[in-house]
Regions:
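Long, amphipathic, Lys/Arg-enriched alpha-helical "connector/arm" segment
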Residues: 31-58
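N-terminal DNA-binding recognition helix of tyrosine site-specific recombinases/integrases
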Residues: 1-23, 75
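Short basic/aromatic active-site micro-motif
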Residues: 60, 134-137, 153-173
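C-terminal secondary-structure termini that scaffold catalytic or DNA-interacting sites
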Residues: 209-233
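Active-site/catalytic core of tyrosine-dependent DNA strand-transfer enzymes
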Residues: 110-153
Length: 233
C-alpha cells in the first residue's frame, strides 16, 4: 500500500492527477515503530556550506534545505506557487493546503530558523522554477550523492528534511503542540513520533536544572520559594 501511495504522489507531482483526487487522505497506513532519520545541526551545516557546481544538484540541495527549515513534504513543495506566499504586516508567510491531509498550514517564514528559508527562496527568480523538482527517486539519488560529498553517513531521502525540521524545533524548545501546528499534524501523537531528543538537548536541560539548584542554595535560611524556580524574563 505504501508503494501505491508513492506512485499516486508521483502522479500528482507530475501533473497526471489532481491533488483534490488524492485517495489516501482518509486512509491511514499502519505506522511501523522505528527510528526516523534526521540531520543534526552539524550535519545541516555541512550541507549549507558544501560547494556544488552542478546546477541541478544545487537546485535539489536548496529545495531540501528549504524544507528542512519549513517542514514541507516533497508533494507540498512541488505544488507551491506565488499565491502561497502572503504578506502579513509586511512579513512573508507561507500558506498552503497539504496534499496528503488537506490540512491548511500557515508558516511565518521570518520566524523560522532565522529566516533561512527566505534566504534560499530569494536566490531564485520565481517560485515556479524553484518548485519544479525532478521525480522523487531522482531527487533522492542526488541527495545521496550530496550526503557522501559531505561525509554524512546516513541514508538521506527528501522526507528526512521534514523530520529534521521537527527535531530541530523541539531542540530549540518549541512546544510540541506548536510543532504539531507547523507540520500540519492532525494528532500530537504523530508529532511526538517525529521528535527526537538530541544529546545536546539533554546536556542543555540538565545544565538548566543545575543553575536552578544553585539559585535555591543562595537562600539556605529562607527555605524554598516559588520564585526560585521561575526564570525572570
Amino acid at each position: 500500500m505504501r508503494q501505491l501511495r508513492t506512485l499516486v504522489n508521483e502522479a500528482i507531482n507530475q501533473g497526471y492527477m489532481h491533488a483534490d483526487a488524492y485517495p489516501f487522505r482518509k486512509y491511514k497506513i499502519k505506522q511501523e515503530k522505528g527510528r526516523h532519520e534526521f540531520l543534526t545541526p552539524d550535519e545541516l551545516k555541512k550541507l549549507e556550506t558544501v560547494e556544488v557546481e552542478e546546477e541541478s544538484m544545487r537546485h535539489v540541495l536548496d529545495a531540501f534545505l528549504f524544507c528542512c527549515y519549513t517542514g514541507l513534504r516533497y508533494s507540498d513543495f512541488c505544488q507551491l506557487s506565488p499565491a502561497n506566499f502572503i504578506k502579513v504586516n509586511g512579513k512573508r508567510w507561507l500558506y498552503f493546503k497539504s496534499v496528503k491531509t488537506g490540512v491548511e498550514i500557515r508558516l511565518p517564514l521570518h520566524l523560522l530558523f532565522e529566516s533561512r528559508a527566505l534566504g534560499i527562496l530569494d536566490r531564485y527568480p520565481d517560485i515556479g522554477s524553484f518548485a519544479a523538482l525532478p521525480c522523487n527517486s531522482e531527487v533522492n539519488k542526488q541527495l545521496r550523492k550530496l550526503a557522501e560529498l559531505c561525509g554524512i553517513k546516513k541514508r538521506i531521502t527528501y522526507h528526512v528534511s521534514r523530520h529534521t525540521c521537527a527535531t530541530l524545533l523541539v531542540h530549540q524548545g518549541v512546544a510540541i503542540t506548536t510543532v504539531q501546528k507547523l507540520l500540519g499534524h492532525t494528532s500530537v501523537k504523530t508529532t511526538q513520533i517525529y521528535s527526537e531528543v538530541l544529546s545536546s538537548t539533554i546536556v542543555r536541560d540538565l545544565k538548566n536544572v543545575q543553575r536552578k539548584r544553585k539559585k535555591v542554595k543562595m537562600f539556605p535560611d529562607k527555605g524554598l520559594r516559588t520564585s526560585d524556580f521561575i526564570d525572570n524574563r
